Amino acid sequence: MSNLVHKLIYKSANRAPDLDALVYRGTKKDYATLSEAVENVASNLISLGLHRNERLAVYLEKRHETVIALFGAAAAGGVFVPVNPILKPEQVSYILCDCNVKVLVTSVDRLNLLITVLPQCPDLHTIIVVDSTEKLPVISKLNFIPWDQLCSPSGSVRGSRIIDSDMAAILYTSGSTGKPKGGVLSHRNIVVGAESVAQYLENEPDDRILSVLPLSFDYGFNQLTTAFHTRATCVLSNHLFPREIIKIIQAEKISGLAAVPPLWIQLAQLNWPEITSLRYITNSGGTMPQATLRTLRGILPKTKIFLMYGFTEAFRSTYLPPQEIDIRPNSIGKAIPNTEVLVLREDGTQCAPGEQGELVHRGALVSMGYWNNLEKTSVRFRPFLHQETGLATSEIAVWSGDTVRSDKEGYLYFICRQDEMIKTSGYRVSPTEIEEV
């Protein structure tokens, strides 16, 4: 089985060409149309000189062109870099320079915001503009290509061979301090992530998944890959107000919605009409407050709620099944499929139930490390010491930096970030423990 990102679309197009793949502002693209567009973009990118492992950035809101450009870059053998559309020009410039972006896909309005910073990006040679090219700014040494040209049929252009351990994406996260870090994901990381999540969410082709989170966020991008893996439909939204999300859920008969705690808090404060289509909702990116959880369960009594924990370096680590919420409401759950999660002491030995330690993640979802940052990569990505001693090479696991504990049944509980721990009288104490006292 191929674990290549773009082949999620190709396979679904072969099996169900007429099913809707993407919906944006009421305009639909079925899998056959989407697959053809991705192939055309890939061929033209290769013709433009995008080589294997070179980076293509997309600085756009969610729209059809955004998705096609990202998956087209992967199909060309390149590495896609989705840039959060709310970032300021200096932040965009940092990302373009840090990972040596060669090609940028954007709009005229956004391009005009970047006029002063793009000359600072020495590796950038081509800008693809998704709308009118009549009022383009003049920027020396840059080649401007209209989107229609990139999407035009060009015949089959053979690119480099791609394998699933190749880089597929670099996702930038701000982290807690300093400059944003670029997490490098392989094709295998992304595809196995889609398969794993779809397995426990029980996604099917009749699902309609609403994409409200930024595609620069692994949790947001996964809404696309999970949909494409299962031949479901992904509905793109660039909402300004939470109330708009409720209207889209009604209008598009949405069956799956992923969000983060701040958005769930806002949604829980609104008046909802009766919603019958919403089969499940998911939470990640932080703990959902218990009051918000109770309110949402009252608003959506027939909707399954999945509470999840993850971090960009390993995508998703744990989930709490809906039937466990009442039994252990503060738990972040157990390991998702294709993953093992351990709680380890500082010396690398395994903690006993109830004992606090660091969450360590191993398996197919462990990413390739941080782009251009060997020092931080070596701290978080380290050899896993509990493997069979006869193996000649060491497996790399990722140390989360999060303090957790497990119960006797193996369910995990988040305590705090390790950099938030307070040392007193020789002991390390979490802020949560102090608050409880």
Sequence positions of predicted segments:
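Gly/Ser/Thr-rich phosphate-binding loop
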Residues: 254-259, 268-328, 340, 350
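AMP-binding/adenylate-forming catalytic core of the ANL superfamily
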Residues: 87, 104, 249, 257, ...
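Conserved structural elements of the adenylate-forming
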Residues: 35-40, 152, 183-204, 212
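ANL superfamily adenylate-forming
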Residues: 26, 111-164
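Conserved AMP-binding/adenylation subdomain of ANL enzymes
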Residues: 191-208, 215-256, 270
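Conserved pre-ATP/AMP-binding loop-to-beta segment of ANL
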Residues: 2, 17-18, 128-129, 144-145, ...
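Conserved AMP-binding A3 loop
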Residues: 30-32, 161, 168-192
